[in-house]
Amino acid sequence: MSSSVTPTKYVLNSFNSVPRLSYAKSIDIKDSLTDLIKIQRDSYNAFIGVGQNTESGIKNIFESMFPIEDLLGRAVLEFVSYSIGEPQYDEYECIKRGITFSVPIRIVLRFIVWKVQEVSFKEVKYVVDEETSEKSIKYIKEQEVSIGDLPTMTPHGTFIINGIERVIVSQMHRSPGVFFDSDKGKTYSSGKLIYSARIIPYRGSWLDFEFDIKDILYFRIDRKRKLPVSLLLRALGLSNNDILNTFYDKIRYVKCEKGWIVPFVVDRFRGVRLSHDLVDVNGNVLVKANTRITLRMAKKLANDGLTEYLVPFAEIQGLFIANDLFDPSGNALIISAGENITSEHINKLELFDIKEIFVLNIDFLTVGPYILNTLFLDKNVTYEDALFEIYKVLRSGESPSLDTIKAFFDGLFFEKERYDLSTVGRIKLNDHLGLNVSEDITVLTKDDIIHVIKKLVLLRDGEGSVDDIDHLGNRRVRSVGEFIENQFRIGILRLERMIMDYMSSVNFDNAMPCDFVNPKILATVLKDFFSSSQLSQFMDQTNPLSEVTHKRRLSALGPGGLTRERAGFEVRDVHPTHYGRICPIETPEGQNIGLISSLAIYARINKHGFIESPYRKVDKGVVTDKVEYLLAMQESNYYIADASATLDENNQFVDDMLYCRHDGNFVMVKREEVDYIDVSPKQIVSVAASLIPFLENNDANRALMGSNMQRQAVPLLKADAPLIGTGMESIVAAGSGTVVLAKRGGIVHRVDGLYIVIRAFDQEKNEYLGVDVYNLRKFQRSNHNTCINQRPLVKPGDYVKANDVIADGSAIDQGELALGKNVLVAFMSWQGYNFEDSIVISSEVVKKDVFTSIHIEEFECVVRDTTLGPEKIMRSVPDINEDSLSHLDDVGIVNIGAEVSAGDILVGKVTPRPPISLPPETKLLVTIFGEKVFDCVDSSLYLPLDVEGTVVDVHVFVRRGVEENDRSLLIKQNEINGFIKERDYEIDVVSEYFYDELKRVLVNSGVQCNNQNVNDYLESTPKKDWWNVNLSDETVLLQINNLREKFDSMIQNAHSKFDQKIDKLNYGYDLPQGVLCIVKVFVAVKHNLQPGDKMSGRHGNKGVISRIVPVEDMPYLEDGTPVDIILNSLGVPSRMNVGQILETHFGWASVNLGKKIGHILDNIDELTISHLRNFLDQVYDGQDLKYNIQSMSDEDLLAFAERLRGGVPMAAPVFEGPKDSQISNLLKLADLDVSGQVDLYDGRIGEKFDRKVTVGYIYMLKLHHLVDDKIHARSVGPYGLVTQQPLGGKSHFGGQRFGEMECWALQAYGAAYTLQEMLTVKSDDIVGRVKIYESIIKGDSNFECGIPESFNVMVKELRSLCLDVALKQDKDFLSSEVNN
């Protein structure tokens, strides 16, 4: 297949990434990829009602709660409308201030008080309006009331809670509805299948049905004690006859001279062995006794005209009567409904000459007597008895009235206030049971319960199959909007109860709507959810990919979900319905494996919470461009071909027969029968997995590790996009929110390190839209202490389109995701230093800061008001010399840009202490020499021991009402200057445009301006006076006035925004009680690569750096180029991640093609430009780009080729990577050996290695498992209180313990005294270790060992088991024991 290039049309701009040479042949649904966090945003918008056709979740909650009437009906509180305000601060200001990014919610309430004549406990007599005959209104009060603040979503799909960016993870849970299941024969040793059914509501009580080993059907409510299902049916109002008639068909038996005449029904004879001859009504024998009748035979008999047959009189014995049967007089009961007909009953039928009976259609083969048997367990139970039995199980110990019990039972399943199936549950119930109940009815009905029981009985009879609970048709996704809606509902219900309580005690004459509402109630509920819910998580902000993945994560854990301890293998496993919906690769490796997963790349979630996957429609063997999204339930009905199916130029299948997916299986069908085809081979994987080139060549376990480790990659000092990508890099970068995207198209007006100013302009309409000013984030700290830094890509004069990348973020290069570096790798062993996945690195890599990363550490100093007086920030800290304060300013706060190291003071602070009494001689010396006596102690903020770096930012927050220090005033002034600059930028752009427009209008009009020529007037008059020109032409004046209005409006808008920002800045800061000031210092720490750091490729090939080798000792190529990294070749075969080898070859070709292009450029002339053009045609062997290359000007061609010097960027999309032959062709084109191997020379002795080595370029990542964060040493530190042994871990400043296996080692060497020391004085012998410390100080080498504390702990535990253990100190006793 010939390669193609994406994007197809290349426009040479400085901010464009170089197009990748791609081998993909499938189409991409660009619309699905432009917004990777659509699921988060759409869910939240549906809740608040933004951009939705349906009503918002907030409005529905308010309408379900209101109106609220007081208990006596004297007044009512009605809901009118609601409004959502604007946030007080933007998201970055909220992070800076440590507050929640939220919007105020206000509702308009109407309080109506009725005129009443008389009020009693029983009733209220209202004053009735004579005209309308309705209750008269005493007065109406309407008011807008605040009910609290709602945390709002940022444009990036996150929430900022108390200054921390958080993500609400979507949850996979069992969909509301009915589910049928079996125990798969595991409950009883006989292996008998026990069937059950469960009705799960969205909110309310669960209803279970289950058979037991005796085939009696029971039910449970909320997993309480089980009861016979006949009790539930009677509680629903059904009598015994009703129950039998509902669940069983009747068969009519008519008596004649020869026996009973019975209708012939084909299904009743299927597979039946006749106990007697089958005789028609005329006495003809149709089938002999002991014959097994097949379905075909039964149908033939029916077709031959058999409608009735004869049964001998005695054969009705054992059948079940359908109705109560009375004698002809109607007084005596012969047989009760449901009873088994016995010989005695047959005699009675003869005696009373009964001509016709009806029996139940129970044949014990296709229809069993399960309901009948259950009914006979408690045949004489009445409706009231059934209700009492159910109530007794659910509310034991109570004895209420019958009315109370009825109300309680109705509330369980039939009232909206306590039970809610939700729309999804009703749809699932209708679909499962074949009902046609309206979706608005979200409570259970009597028919629902009866149909569930019927289907469960059919399952027991062998008809149908149980549900697969892991099928995605039975699992749905709850996203952020649904979670917040549920919490909002809880808060509003609490508010409702409070309002009703208040109504019962308030004087209505003086009450206003605001008196009823306490805004703290809703705020408390929402705060608890966002702060402590298992699904509200601290956002993984290590790099842009980790952010995107976290927002697209699906968790089966959390409230209402599974627990990792009880989750079995089935729920964790990959299911066929996950195809195109949930990634089968990306999941954690630990105990959460399979419970946490990621949404597939093209998947979307519909309004009911079910995951849909896109497919291209196939019409009579021709693949169309129409894309349809299918649910897992719908997909099983169609034949779906794989995206790799070969198509001709007319998009028709080449092969007559194709493998297709159908109902969870792979089948071979004709091409005309195919309904759909996959849109892309990569639609089955997640975003992270789609970034792995040659994924199809890797083992699944290693692909899982590769997906997970990309999320752990640390952004490097200089981002470098991979030479070998997959084509997804730019899409992930744009969707991550890390880059800056142009809101509107326009022309770049000004660019600097902090701002990009764009004059928004619509080229098609030739219309000016305004000014967009973009603030760039500089050296800000992420949640994981990585550095967020945005760099502009555009330059003044560039034209940008909407959604163009105009500034890179961290780990972004030219708008493409860049998590690591392209480095030269050799696969070989080297002196044993790359044993067991260890990695050998060249010192040149460290020297050039290839893998150096910047981390921002935050340190906080809090100034409090103490009982002895306020703490103070000051430079003159007691007992600190001047040299240690040199990097502090006059206030006592470190300067930005200062180089600080361990132990340096960042903020000088003193805390008052109680005054101390000085002796007289000291007082005299103080008086004589004028020395200060400090009544305070040093409480400064010091830099921790393991940190060294540069101060990049300082924030000072002073409590409102407290006098600000000079540093905080300076910081505030700098912020104001930034606002002024931003305002001036906007005004400059607006002024430039409108003055140009005004000049164009005046010049084109050709009129005299103030009796002067237009050009002369404009040159001699200041621009601000141009508006005051005197003209006689009314048309021109009208145009000028319109321009003036727009100009003044935009200028006024710029000043208004500036004033708002200044007001917010001057408002001050709300700090916690007792806090006067908070100083935050941000230190940038540079982490160079060093032994112990963890590195990885994208194929799960991880390792730890074992040694940094001098560059002169590293193996080198024939041209003298030393390799950067040496990997162990034994790490490939057993791991089966061959993708890294293919990436190495592909990268080797890419870089050498770039070198060849660079060589042509170095010797460029008119002849070689043609040669360069032809060579690029060969490299980009695709028609789309070939046309562009041939049509490029020489200047553009040279600029394009110049950007290929470092290597030709290539894409190996998932499951569509280049074949071996294509890689070989590129190696040949680059004048390389097609084996991909080269001769290497030993850098230490200069000799060539015995055989060729695989060398090439691979994309390596530095992971956030840095040795600086892990290495730890301790001499003295904290001990455990009970065992008196050192604590464990770096966070506790712990140490290592001498454990059981270490004791074995000393025992093996017979080192008894060393072992005694290790277990006593060097460990937890409290007295002994103090004594040995004293002896060391004294220079004495003698010591005694005591009893270790761990032995005392063991003795205490034995005593707790009532074993009295005592130690005897008698030396004579010990010697006698030894002698014995």
Curated annotation (Swiss-Prot):
InterPro entries the record matches: DNA-dir_RNA_pol_bsu_ext_1_sf, DNA-dir_RNA_pol_bsu_external_1, DNA-dir_RNA_pol_su2, DNA-dir_RNAP_su2_dom, DNA-dir_RNAP_su2_hyb_sf, RNA_pol_bsu_bac, RNA_pol_bsu_CS, RNA_pol_bsu_protrusion
Pfam families for this protein: RNA_pol_Rpb2_1 (PF04563), RNA_pol_Rpb2_2 (PF04561), RNA_pol_Rpb2_3 (PF04565), RNA_pol_Rpb2_45 (PF10385), RNA_pol_Rpb2_6 (PF00562), RNA_pol_Rpb2_7 (PF04560)
Documented EC number(s): 2.7.7.6
Domain of life: Bacteria
Any one Gene Ontology molecular-function term assigned to this protein's record: ribonucleoside binding
An example Gene Ontology CC term for this record: DNA-directed RNA polymerase complex
Biological processes annotated in GO: DNA-templated transcription
Catalytic activity, reaction form: RNA(n) + a ribonucleoside 5'-triphosphate = RNA(n+1) + diphosphate
Broad class of enzyme this protein falls into: transferase
Keywords: DNA-directed RNA polymerase, Nucleotidyltransferase, Transcription, Transferase
The protein's assembly and partners: The RNAP catalytic core consists of 2 alpha, 1 beta, 1 beta' and 1 omega subunit. When a sigma factor is associated with the core the holoenzyme is formed, which can initiate transcription.
Free-text function comment from the UniProt entry: DNA-dependent RNA polymerase catalyzes the transcription of DNA into RNA using the four ribonucleoside triphosphates as substrates.
Recorded family membership: Belongs to the RNA polymerase beta chain family.
Protein name: DNA-directed RNA polymerase subunit beta
Gene: rpoB
